[in-house]
């Protein structure tokens, strides 16, 4: 139960403020009221459910901060950079500018990975381009596997490490800065599964304004979006391993030219979303 006092003195009624702020986000997002509720609850330090308490008020200082953040969101700045966190697989992940925000559809990649881990008794997993650590930390959290994660961004490595500590898996989630699996060359032979949500957006693609605030190296995969896959499969011998990666829905035919013996899987929306290569001997 929230212990904040009801409206009095110079405090403003919270729902008057929420209505005004929601109007500022119309045309920016389809979930303007929800986003304002999340921003307000963040500033006040209470659950958004407690905002429904009758006559709850905000101080002038709190109102000023809320308005600043709403204006920032209205400019296109990503909501989850403002909130400083994003839920993924039922877990709260720290995110900040310079780190890719995990997407809901990537939860399906993690669920597929967990099924394969259970089926084959996999003990060692790699996560390339870990970002916030959403994939790798979730795998470590919901299985007994050890995860070796990499990212080219120092900021991402820092945040991923914090998220591993936050969710109690820092003893099984190890992250280093570098491209592909180069930082863990000495572990490559022992890695049984390789996961990634790589940059696969075409360089010419037109993206929503808020997405453009995210690190371009986590989004764009060259002219046709396939640079990552070409380099990865050209560089590494995946014999004896399982590779599971996210892909663009229109990239299946071109990916077939890059790697053979691959299964392409659809997501819950019926779109091709995952590349699965199983080269285990059993």
Swiss-Prot record:
EC numbers: 2.1.1.297
Q: What class of enzyme is it?
A: transferase
Quote the CDD domains the UniProt record gives: AdoMet_MTases
Per UniProt, substrate binds at 197-200
**GO MF entries:** nucleic acid binding; protein-(glutamine-N5) methyltransferase activity; protein-glutamine N-methyltransferase activity
Tell me the residue numbers annotated for binding S-adenosyl-L-methionine.
129-133, 151, 180, 197
**Keywords on record:** Methyltransferase, S-adenosyl-L-methionine, Transferase
The GO biological-process annotations, alphabetized, read as: methylation; translational termination
- Which catalytic reaction applies to this protein? L-glutaminyl-[peptide chain release factor] + S-adenosyl-L-methionine = N(5)-methyl-L-glutaminyl-[peptide chain release factor] + S-adenosyl-L-homocysteine + H(+)
Q: Subunit details for this protein?
A: Monomer and homodimer.
- What is the annotated role of this protein in its UniProt record? Methylates the class 1 translation termination release factors RF1/PrfA and RF2/PrfB on the glutamine residue of the universally conserved GGQ motif.
Any other comment in the entry?
A: The crystal structure corresponding to PDB 1SG9 shows a glutamate anhydride cross-link formed between the Glu-97 side chains from two molecules, but this has not been observed in other PrmC structures from T.maritima. This cross-link is suggested being an artifact of concentration during crystallization.
Similarity-based family: Belongs to the protein N5-glutamine methyltransferase family. PrmC subfamily.
- Name of this protein: Release factor glutamine methyltransferase
Q: What is the lineage of its organism?
A: Bacteria, Thermotogati, Thermotogota, Thermotogae, Thermotogales
Write the gene name: prmC
């Amino acid at each position: 139960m929230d212990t904040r006092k009801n409206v009095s003195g110079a405090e403003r009624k919270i729902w008057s403020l929420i209505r005004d702020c929601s109007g500022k986000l119309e045309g920016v997002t389809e979930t303007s009221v929800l986003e304002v509720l999340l921003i307000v609850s963040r500033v006040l330090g209470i659950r958004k459910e407690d905002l429904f308490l009758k006559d709850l008020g905000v101080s002038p200082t709190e109102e000023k901060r809320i308005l600043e953040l709403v204006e920032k969101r209205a400019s296109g700045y990503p909501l989850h950079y403002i909130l400083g966190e994003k839920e993924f697989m039922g877990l709260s992940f720290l995110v900040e500018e310079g780190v890719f925000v995990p997407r809901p559809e990537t939860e399906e990649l993690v669920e597929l990975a967990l099924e394969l881990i259970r089926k084959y008794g996999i003990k060692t997993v790699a996560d390339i381009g870990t970002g916030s650590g959403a994939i790798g930390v979730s795998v470590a959290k919901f299985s007994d596997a050890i995860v070796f994660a990499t990212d080219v961004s120092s900021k991402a490595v820092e945040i991923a490490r914090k998220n591993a500590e936050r969710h109690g898996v820092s003893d099984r989630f190890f992250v280093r800065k570098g491209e592909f699996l180069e930082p863990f060359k000495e572990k490559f032979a022992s890695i049984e599964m390789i996961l990634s949500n790589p940059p696969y957006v075409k360089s010419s693609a037109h993206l929503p304004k808020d997405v453009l605030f995210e690190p371009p190296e986590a989004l764009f995969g060259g002219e046709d979006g396939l640079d990552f896959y070409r380099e990865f499969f050209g560089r590494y011998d995946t014999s004896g391993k399982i590779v599971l990666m996210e892909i663009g829905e229109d990239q299946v035919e071109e990916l077939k030219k890059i790697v053979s013996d691959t299964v392409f899987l659809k997501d819950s929306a019926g779109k091709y979303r995952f590349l699965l290569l199983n080269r285990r001997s059993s």
